[in-house]
């Protein structure tokens, strides 16, 4: 038996905001009677940028900055039209990127 799945992938730089957004989506989806699988934590991307502190020489003096992207996956099994309508209305913080696949 094939079942419909909606996959929601959230990305953000702050893990607390991503987790807070996931709980909002789970509460909204479960309110319509849909089954929710997750949240599944995906590997965190870490981007390290190294720059020289001095302008001309002194290569030994460097500074490193890093940017971490936290990701979570959520699956909603057999979503109804009401589930999709509720998910469109969920207000998420500005630091979260959402990607929905059916």
Curated annotation (Swiss-Prot):
SMART domains for this protein: Ribosomal_S10
Gene Ontology molecular function, alphabetical: structural constituent of ribosome; tRNA binding
GO biological process: one example: translation
UniProt record similarity statement: Belongs to the universal ribosomal protein uS10 family.
Keywords in alphabetical order: Ribonucleoprotein, Ribosomal protein
Keyword GTP-binding applies: no
Protein name from the UniProt record: Small ribosomal subunit protein uS10
Subunit: Part of the 30S ribosomal subunit.
A GO CC term attached to the entry: ribosome
Source organism of this protein record: Mycoplasma capricolum subsp. capricolum (strain California kid / ATCC 27343 / NCTC 10154)
